[in-house]
Amino acid sequence: MRIYENPKSTSENRLNARSWYIPEGSCKQIMLNGEWRFAFFENGDRAGNIEEWETIEVPSCWQLKGYENPNYTNINYPFPCDPPYVPDINPTGVYERSFQIEDGSLKTYFVFEGVSSEAELYINGKYVGRTQGSRLTAEFDITEFVSSGTNTARVYVRKWCCGSYLEDQDAFRYNGIFRDVYVLSRPHGHIFDIDIKTEENDIICTADAEFSAELYDGDALLERRDSVGGKAVFTVNEPSLWTAETPYLYTVKLYAAGEIITRKIGFRTIKISSDYELLINGTPVKLKGVNHHDTDPYKGWTMSEEDYVRDLKLMKELNINTVRTSHYPPAPKFLDYCDEMGFYVILECDIETHGFVRRYADIGYKFDTENGDWPCVEEMWKKEFLDRIERTYERDKIHTSVIMWSTGNESAYGVNQAAQIDWLKSRDKVRLAHCEDASRAGSQEKPTYFQ
Protein backbone atom coordinates (compact mmCIF):
# COMPACT_ATOMS: atom_id res chain seq x y z
CA MET A 1 0.00 0.00 0.00
CA ARG A 2 1.36 3.39 -1.00
CA ILE A 3 1.22 6.08 1.66
CA TYR A 4 -1.41 8.08 -0.22
CA GLU A 5 -3.67 4.98 -0.27
CA ASN A 6 -3.77 4.60 3.51
CA PRO A 7 -6.98 6.03 5.03
CA LYS A 8 -5.37 6.02 8.47
CA SER A 9 -2.54 8.28 7.33
CA THR A 10 -3.97 11.02 5.13
CA SER A 11 -1.74 13.86 6.30
CA GLU A 12 1.69 14.58 7.71
CA ASN A 13 2.67 17.71 9.64
CA ARG A 14 -0.57 19.52 8.82
CA LEU A 15 -1.61 21.78 11.67
CA ASN A 16 -4.83 21.28 13.57
CA ALA A 17 -7.79 23.04 11.98
CA ARG A 18 -8.69 26.48 13.30
CA SER A 19 -11.23 29.22 12.68
CA TRP A 20 -10.58 30.96 9.39
CA TYR A 21 -9.36 34.55 9.54
CA ILE A 22 -6.68 36.75 7.96
CA PRO A 23 -4.97 38.85 10.65
CA GLU A 24 -4.22 42.52 10.15
CA GLY A 25 -1.53 44.61 11.82
CA SER A 26 1.85 42.95 12.24
CA CYS A 27 0.86 39.88 10.20
CA LYS A 28 2.05 39.80 6.60
CA GLN A 29 -0.06 37.87 4.11
CA ILE A 30 1.88 36.86 1.00
CA MET A 31 -0.60 35.88 -1.70
CA LEU A 32 0.77 33.19 -3.99
CA ASN A 33 -2.05 33.42 -6.51
CA GLY A 34 -0.76 34.08 -10.00
CA GLU A 35 1.68 32.40 -12.34
CA TRP A 36 3.46 29.25 -11.17
CA ARG A 37 5.93 27.03 -12.93
CA PHE A 38 4.19 23.77 -13.82
CA ALA A 39 5.02 20.29 -15.07
CA PHE A 40 2.45 17.58 -15.77
CA PHE A 41 3.15 13.85 -15.54
CA GLU A 42 0.76 11.18 -16.76
CA ASN A 43 2.34 8.89 -14.17
CA GLY A 44 3.16 10.64 -10.95
CA ASP A 45 5.65 7.98 -9.91
CA ARG A 46 7.90 9.35 -12.66
CA ALA A 47 7.76 12.95 -11.46
CA GLY A 48 11.50 13.32 -10.93
CA ASN A 49 13.92 15.95 -12.20
CA ILE A 50 12.21 18.63 -14.26
CA GLU A 51 14.36 20.23 -16.94
CA GLU A 52 11.67 22.23 -18.74
CA TRP A 53 8.82 24.02 -17.03
CA GLU A 54 5.60 25.37 -18.43
CA THR A 55 3.47 27.91 -16.55
CA ILE A 56 -0.03 27.74 -15.11
CA GLU A 57 -2.34 30.21 -13.41
CA VAL A 58 -3.14 29.55 -9.75
CA PRO A 59 -5.82 29.09 -8.56
CA SER A 60 -7.15 26.97 -11.41
CA CYS A 61 -8.08 23.44 -12.44
CA TRP A 62 -5.49 21.88 -14.71
CA GLN A 63 -8.16 20.18 -16.87
CA LEU A 64 -9.22 23.68 -17.98
CA LYS A 65 -5.64 24.76 -18.67
CA GLY A 66 -4.82 22.22 -21.37
CA TYR A 67 -3.86 19.20 -19.23
CA GLU A 68 -6.35 16.33 -19.58
CA ASN A 69 -10.06 16.88 -20.22
CA PRO A 70 -12.83 17.61 -17.74
CA ASN A 71 -14.53 14.42 -16.57
CA TYR A 72 -18.14 14.27 -15.42
CA THR A 73 -19.60 11.38 -13.49
CA ASN A 74 -22.51 11.14 -11.10
CA ILE A 75 -22.45 7.77 -9.37
CA ASN A 76 -19.54 5.80 -10.79
CA TYR A 77 -16.03 6.45 -9.58
CA PRO A 78 -13.70 7.64 -12.36
CA PHE A 79 -11.47 4.64 -11.59
CA PRO A 80 -12.06 0.98 -10.61
CA CYS A 81 -13.68 0.78 -7.18
CA ASP A 82 -11.12 -1.20 -5.19
CA PRO A 83 -10.79 0.68 -1.89
CA PRO A 84 -8.51 2.09 -0.72
CA TYR A 85 -6.36 1.61 -3.83
CA VAL A 86 -6.17 3.97 -6.81
CA PRO A 87 -4.75 3.31 -10.29
CA ASP A 88 -1.02 2.80 -10.69
CA ILE A 89 -1.07 5.35 -13.50
CA ASN A 90 -1.88 8.39 -11.39
CA PRO A 91 -1.42 11.78 -13.12
CA THR A 92 0.42 14.39 -11.09
CA GLY A 93 0.91 18.12 -11.43
CA VAL A 94 4.09 19.69 -10.06
CA TYR A 95 3.82 23.36 -9.08
CA GLU A 96 6.71 25.66 -8.18
CA ARG A 97 7.15 29.35 -7.44
CA SER A 98 9.36 31.66 -5.41
CA PHE A 99 8.24 34.14 -2.79
CA GLN A 100 9.84 36.76 -0.58
CA ILE A 101 10.03 36.67 3.22
CA GLU A 102 10.87 40.01 4.82
CA ASP A 103 11.69 38.64 8.26
CA GLY A 104 12.63 34.98 8.56
CA SER A 105 12.53 35.15 12.36
CA LEU A 106 8.71 35.35 12.41
CA LYS A 107 6.36 32.38 12.61
CA THR A 108 5.56 31.46 9.02
CA TYR A 109 2.67 29.37 7.71
CA PHE A 110 1.76 27.98 4.30
CA VAL A 111 -1.99 27.75 3.64
CA PHE A 112 -3.98 25.91 0.96
CA GLU A 113 -7.69 26.74 0.87
CA GLY A 114 -8.34 24.06 -1.75
CA VAL A 115 -6.15 21.52 -3.55
CA SER A 116 -7.23 18.25 -5.20
CA SER A 117 -6.73 15.49 -4.38
CA GLU A 118 -3.49 15.09 -2.39
CA ALA A 119 -0.70 17.64 -2.06
CA GLU A 120 2.90 17.23 -0.91
CA LEU A 121 4.61 20.47 0.07
CA TYR A 122 8.35 21.17 -0.18
CA ILE A 123 10.02 24.43 0.83
CA ASN A 124 13.53 25.16 -0.43
CA GLY A 125 13.89 21.52 -1.43
CA LYS A 126 12.91 20.12 1.97
CA TYR A 127 9.80 18.05 2.62
CA VAL A 128 7.27 19.84 4.83
CA GLY A 129 4.17 17.64 4.79
CA ARG A 130 1.15 16.43 2.87
CA THR A 131 -2.62 16.70 2.99
CA GLN A 132 -5.84 15.23 1.61
CA GLY A 133 -9.38 16.61 1.69
CA SER A 134 -9.76 18.66 -1.46
CA ARG A 135 -12.15 21.37 -0.22
CA LEU A 136 -10.74 21.64 3.30
CA THR A 137 -8.17 24.20 4.38
CA ALA A 138 -4.68 22.83 5.07
CA GLU A 139 -2.06 24.82 6.98
CA PHE A 140 1.61 24.01 7.59
CA ASP A 141 4.18 25.61 9.87
CA ILE A 142 7.16 26.37 7.59
CA THR A 143 9.09 28.55 10.05
CA GLU A 144 12.06 26.18 10.15
CA PHE A 145 12.16 25.91 6.35
CA VAL A 146 12.31 29.58 5.33
CA SER A 147 14.72 32.47 5.75
CA SER A 148 14.69 36.17 4.97
CA GLY A 149 14.78 36.81 1.24
CA THR A 150 13.82 34.48 -1.60
CA ASN A 151 12.27 31.09 -0.85
CA THR A 152 10.83 28.44 -3.16
CA ALA A 153 7.72 26.31 -2.73
CA ARG A 154 7.16 23.13 -4.71
CA VAL A 155 3.88 21.22 -4.54
CA TYR A 156 3.19 17.75 -5.94
CA VAL A 157 -0.55 17.33 -6.56
CA ARG A 158 -1.84 13.81 -7.22
CA LYS A 159 -5.01 13.30 -9.21
CA TRP A 160 -6.19 10.45 -6.98
CA CYS A 161 -5.57 9.19 -3.46
CA CYS A 162 -7.54 7.13 -0.95
CA GLY A 163 -9.45 10.29 -0.10
CA SER A 164 -10.88 10.23 -3.63
CA TYR A 165 -13.19 7.43 -2.43
CA LEU A 166 -14.79 10.02 -0.13
CA GLU A 167 -15.16 12.64 -2.88
CA ASP A 168 -17.56 10.99 -5.35
CA GLN A 169 -19.80 14.03 -5.70
CA ASP A 170 -22.16 14.42 -8.67
CA ALA A 171 -20.10 17.02 -10.53
CA PHE A 172 -17.31 17.60 -12.99
CA ARG A 173 -14.06 16.24 -11.57
CA TYR A 174 -11.08 18.58 -11.55
CA ASN A 175 -7.62 18.76 -10.01
CA GLY A 176 -5.02 21.30 -9.05
CA ILE A 177 -4.57 24.18 -6.63
CA PHE A 178 -8.04 25.59 -7.26
CA ARG A 179 -8.50 28.01 -4.34
CA ASP A 180 -6.36 30.70 -2.76
CA VAL A 181 -2.89 29.75 -1.58
CA TYR A 182 -0.79 32.06 0.59
CA VAL A 183 1.87 32.45 3.26
CA LEU A 184 1.28 34.12 6.63
CA SER A 185 4.21 35.65 8.52
CA ARG A 186 3.08 36.17 12.11
CA PRO A 187 4.69 37.37 15.35
CA HIS A 188 5.66 34.86 18.01
CA GLY A 189 3.01 34.53 20.70
CA HIS A 190 0.16 35.13 18.26
CA ILE A 191 -3.34 33.75 18.67
CA PHE A 192 -3.87 30.56 16.68
CA ASP A 193 -7.50 29.53 17.18
CA ILE A 194 -10.46 31.65 18.23
CA ASP A 195 -14.14 31.09 18.85
CA ILE A 196 -16.94 33.63 19.17
CA LYS A 197 -20.38 32.55 20.35
CA THR A 198 -23.57 34.13 21.60
CA GLU A 199 -25.56 33.00 24.64
CA GLU A 200 -28.69 34.98 25.48
CA ASN A 201 -27.38 38.60 25.59
CA ASP A 202 -23.69 37.69 25.78
CA ILE A 203 -20.98 37.53 23.14
CA ILE A 204 -18.32 35.10 24.37
CA CYS A 205 -14.84 35.34 22.84
CA THR A 206 -12.22 32.66 23.49
CA ALA A 207 -8.71 32.12 22.17
CA ASP A 208 -5.60 30.09 22.90
CA ALA A 209 -3.67 33.19 24.02
CA GLU A 210 -4.50 36.29 26.04
CA PHE A 211 -5.96 39.22 24.10
CA SER A 212 -7.75 42.54 24.29
CA ALA A 213 -11.12 42.81 22.58
CA GLU A 214 -13.43 45.49 21.24
CA LEU A 215 -17.10 45.16 20.36
CA TYR A 216 -18.66 47.37 17.69
CA ASP A 217 -22.22 48.01 16.57
CA GLY A 218 -21.59 49.33 13.09
CA ASP A 219 -18.88 51.96 13.53
CA ALA A 220 -19.80 52.62 17.16
CA LEU A 221 -17.48 51.16 19.79
CA LEU A 222 -19.63 49.58 22.49
CA GLU A 223 -17.04 48.19 24.88
CA ARG A 224 -13.40 47.17 25.41
CA ARG A 225 -12.31 44.20 27.50
CA ASP A 226 -9.15 42.28 28.34
CA SER A 227 -9.34 38.51 28.36
CA VAL A 228 -8.90 36.45 31.50
CA GLY A 229 -7.73 32.92 30.88
CA GLY A 230 -8.19 33.44 27.14
CA LYS A 231 -11.84 34.51 27.52
CA ALA A 232 -13.72 37.80 27.29
CA VAL A 233 -17.48 38.31 27.55
CA PHE A 234 -19.54 41.25 26.28
CA THR A 235 -23.13 41.81 27.36
CA VAL A 236 -25.44 43.57 24.91
CA ASN A 237 -28.70 44.90 26.28
CA GLU A 238 -31.64 44.21 23.96
CA PRO A 239 -29.47 43.07 21.05
CA SER A 240 -30.72 43.21 17.48
CA LEU A 241 -31.34 39.66 16.28
CA TRP A 242 -29.95 38.00 13.16
CA THR A 243 -32.23 36.24 10.67
CA ALA A 244 -32.00 35.62 6.94
CA GLU A 245 -34.35 38.59 6.46
CA THR A 246 -32.61 40.84 9.00
CA PRO A 247 -28.92 39.82 8.98
CA TYR A 248 -27.79 42.08 11.82
CA LEU A 249 -24.15 41.59 12.79
CA TYR A 250 -21.88 42.95 15.48
CA THR A 251 -18.13 43.27 14.93
CA VAL A 252 -15.53 41.84 17.30
CA LYS A 253 -11.86 42.80 17.12
CA LEU A 254 -9.24 40.79 19.00
CA TYR A 255 -5.78 42.30 19.65
CA ALA A 256 -2.74 40.19 20.48
CA ALA A 257 0.99 40.27 19.65
CA GLY A 258 0.50 43.29 17.39
CA GLU A 259 -2.17 41.55 15.30
CA ILE A 260 -5.83 42.43 14.84
CA ILE A 261 -8.36 39.67 14.12
CA THR A 262 -11.76 40.96 13.00
CA ARG A 263 -14.84 38.76 12.84
CA LYS A 264 -18.59 39.38 12.76
CA ILE A 265 -21.21 37.65 14.88
CA GLY A 266 -24.99 37.75 15.17
CA PHE A 267 -27.48 36.87 17.89
CA ARG A 268 -29.75 34.00 16.85
CA THR A 269 -31.12 30.87 18.47
CA ILE A 270 -31.95 27.52 16.84
CA LYS A 271 -34.54 25.11 18.22
CA ILE A 272 -36.79 22.28 17.07
CA SER A 273 -40.22 22.63 18.66
CA SER A 274 -42.31 19.81 20.10
CA ASP A 275 -44.26 19.96 16.81
CA TYR A 276 -41.01 19.49 14.86
CA GLU A 277 -40.93 23.06 13.62
CA LEU A 278 -37.62 24.82 13.05
CA LEU A 279 -37.52 27.89 15.26
CA ILE A 280 -35.09 30.74 14.66
CA ASN A 281 -35.18 33.18 17.57
CA GLY A 282 -38.35 31.40 18.70
CA THR A 283 -40.20 31.98 15.41
CA PRO A 284 -41.13 29.15 12.99
CA VAL A 285 -39.10 29.35 9.81
CA LYS A 286 -39.63 27.58 6.50
CA LEU A 287 -36.42 26.83 4.66
CA LYS A 288 -36.66 27.72 0.97
CA GLY A 289 -33.37 26.43 -0.27
CA VAL A 290 -31.08 25.28 -3.03
CA ASN A 291 -27.96 23.18 -3.38
CA HIS A 292 -24.98 25.29 -4.39
CA HIS A 293 -21.95 23.83 -6.13
CA ASP A 294 -18.68 25.68 -6.62
CA THR A 295 -18.73 25.46 -10.40
CA ASP A 296 -18.03 27.71 -13.35
CA PRO A 297 -18.06 26.72 -17.05
CA TYR A 298 -14.69 28.35 -17.66
CA LYS A 299 -12.94 28.04 -14.29
CA GLY A 300 -14.33 24.80 -12.89
CA TRP A 301 -14.06 24.69 -9.11
CA THR A 302 -12.31 28.06 -8.92
CA MET A 303 -14.78 30.66 -7.67
CA SER A 304 -14.01 34.33 -7.12
CA GLU A 305 -15.68 36.48 -4.49
CA GLU A 306 -17.56 38.18 -7.32
CA ASP A 307 -18.87 34.79 -8.47
CA TYR A 308 -20.18 34.05 -4.99
CA VAL A 309 -21.86 37.44 -4.63
CA ARG A 310 -23.48 37.05 -8.06
CA ASP A 311 -24.94 33.67 -7.10
CA LEU A 312 -26.19 34.89 -3.73
CA LYS A 313 -27.79 37.99 -5.23
CA LEU A 314 -29.63 35.77 -7.72
CA MET A 315 -30.87 33.61 -4.83
CA LYS A 316 -32.16 36.70 -3.03
CA GLU A 317 -34.03 37.78 -6.17
CA LEU A 318 -35.71 34.34 -6.21
CA ASN A 319 -36.70 34.54 -2.51
CA ILE A 320 -34.34 31.74 -1.53
CA ASN A 321 -33.34 31.89 2.13
CA THR A 322 -31.28 28.70 2.57
CA VAL A 323 -28.14 27.29 0.97
CA ARG A 324 -26.87 23.75 1.28
CA THR A 325 -23.19 23.77 0.37
CA SER A 326 -23.42 20.67 -1.75
CA HIS A 327 -21.49 18.62 -1.23
CA TYR A 328 -18.51 20.13 0.58
CA PRO A 329 -17.43 23.33 2.32
CA PRO A 330 -17.11 26.32 -0.02
CA ALA A 331 -14.25 28.79 0.05
CA PRO A 332 -14.29 30.66 3.38
CA LYS A 333 -15.46 34.02 2.00
CA PHE A 334 -18.73 32.46 0.80
CA LEU A 335 -19.88 32.13 4.39
CA ASP A 336 -18.92 35.71 5.20
CA TYR A 337 -21.33 36.79 2.47
CA CYS A 338 -24.03 34.45 3.78
CA ASP A 339 -23.65 36.06 7.21
CA GLU A 340 -23.84 39.57 5.75
CA MET A 341 -26.51 39.08 3.07
CA GLY A 342 -28.72 36.80 5.15
CA PHE A 343 -28.91 33.09 4.37
CA TYR A 344 -29.42 30.00 6.49
CA VAL A 345 -26.61 27.59 5.66
CA ILE A 346 -26.48 23.81 5.84
CA LEU A 347 -22.73 23.31 5.79
CA GLU A 348 -21.79 19.96 4.29
CA CYS A 349 -18.67 17.94 4.96
CA ASP A 350 -16.53 16.89 1.98
CA ILE A 351 -17.76 13.28 1.93
CA GLU A 352 -19.70 11.32 -0.68
CA THR A 353 -19.27 7.61 -1.48
CA HIS A 354 -22.13 7.20 -3.95
CA GLY A 355 -20.13 4.89 -6.22
CA PHE A 356 -20.46 2.00 -3.80
CA VAL A 357 -24.05 1.44 -4.97
CA ARG A 358 -22.59 0.29 -8.31
CA ARG A 359 -20.00 -1.85 -6.58
CA TYR A 360 -22.94 -3.87 -5.27
CA ALA A 361 -25.27 -3.45 -8.25
CA ASP A 362 -27.10 -6.71 -7.52
CA ILE A 363 -28.42 -5.17 -4.30
CA GLY A 364 -30.04 -2.38 -6.28
CA TYR A 365 -30.19 1.30 -5.56
CA LYS A 366 -30.14 1.28 -1.82
CA PHE A 367 -27.48 1.96 0.74
CA ASP A 368 -27.10 -1.54 2.14
CA THR A 369 -24.23 -1.40 4.61
CA GLU A 370 -24.82 -4.95 5.83
CA ASN A 371 -23.93 -6.49 2.46
CA GLY A 372 -20.88 -4.45 1.50
CA ASP A 373 -17.77 -2.73 2.76
CA TRP A 374 -19.10 0.82 2.68
CA PRO A 375 -16.64 3.35 4.13
CA CYS A 376 -19.26 4.44 6.66
CA VAL A 377 -19.03 1.07 8.44
CA GLU A 378 -15.36 0.23 7.89
CA GLU A 379 -12.99 0.90 10.78
CA MET A 380 -10.14 1.89 8.46
CA TRP A 381 -12.11 4.96 7.31
CA LYS A 382 -13.21 6.20 10.74
CA LYS A 383 -10.23 8.49 11.30
CA GLU A 384 -10.78 10.18 7.94
CA PHE A 385 -14.53 10.63 8.54
CA LEU A 386 -13.73 12.34 11.83
CA ASP A 387 -10.87 14.37 10.40
CA ARG A 388 -13.09 15.80 7.69
CA ILE A 389 -15.95 16.79 9.99
CA GLU A 390 -13.53 18.31 12.50
CA ARG A 391 -11.88 20.42 9.82
CA THR A 392 -15.29 21.49 8.51
CA TYR A 393 -16.51 22.52 11.94
CA GLU A 394 -13.36 24.20 13.20
CA ARG A 395 -12.89 26.39 10.13
CA ASP A 396 -16.45 27.73 10.09
CA LYS A 397 -17.67 27.50 13.68
CA ILE A 398 -18.01 31.27 14.13
CA HIS A 399 -20.45 31.86 11.25
CA THR A 400 -23.92 32.91 12.36
CA SER A 401 -25.43 31.82 9.04
CA VAL A 402 -24.54 28.17 9.68
CA ILE A 403 -27.55 26.60 11.38
CA MET A 404 -26.86 22.95 10.55
CA TRP A 405 -23.89 20.66 9.95
CA SER A 406 -24.10 17.86 7.39
CA THR A 407 -21.90 14.78 7.63
CA GLY A 408 -21.89 14.45 3.84
CA ASN A 409 -24.01 13.30 0.93
CA GLU A 410 -25.10 9.89 -0.41
CA SER A 411 -22.74 7.86 1.74
CA ALA A 412 -25.19 5.49 3.47
CA TYR A 413 -25.23 5.56 7.27
CA GLY A 414 -23.09 3.69 9.74
CA VAL A 415 -20.88 3.88 12.78
CA ASN A 416 -18.56 6.42 11.20
CA GLN A 417 -21.32 8.96 10.67
CA ALA A 418 -22.55 8.21 14.18
CA ALA A 419 -19.05 9.07 15.41
CA GLN A 420 -19.18 12.30 13.41
CA ILE A 421 -22.51 13.23 14.99
CA ASP A 422 -21.24 12.43 18.48
CA TRP A 423 -18.17 14.58 17.90
CA LEU A 424 -20.24 17.48 16.58
CA LYS A 425 -22.63 17.41 19.51
CA SER A 426 -19.69 17.40 21.92
CA ARG A 427 -18.45 20.64 20.33
CA ASP A 428 -21.65 22.41 19.35
CA LYS A 429 -24.65 22.50 21.68
CA VAL A 430 -26.69 24.86 19.49
CA ARG A 431 -26.74 23.87 15.84
CA LEU A 432 -28.47 20.89 14.26
CA ALA A 433 -26.53 17.99 12.77
CA HIS A 434 -27.74 16.12 9.70
CA CYS A 435 -26.97 12.92 7.79
CA GLU A 436 -28.59 12.93 4.35
CA ASP A 437 -28.76 9.14 4.00
CA ALA A 438 -29.72 8.13 7.52
CA SER A 439 -33.44 7.69 6.89
CA ARG A 440 -33.07 5.59 3.72
CA ALA A 441 -30.15 3.53 4.92
CA GLY A 442 -32.32 1.26 7.03
CA SER A 443 -34.13 1.63 10.33
CA GLN A 444 -36.25 4.70 10.99
CA GLU A 445 -34.49 4.76 14.34
CA LYS A 446 -31.69 6.47 12.44
CA PRO A 447 -33.05 10.00 12.06
CA THR A 448 -32.00 12.30 9.25
CA TYR A 449 -31.78 15.26 11.64
CA PHE A 450 -30.24 15.21 15.07
CA GLN A 451 -30.96 17.82 17.74
Language-model features: locations:
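Substrate-binding/catalytic cleft of secreted carbohydrate-active enzymes
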Residues: 204, 312-313, 322-451
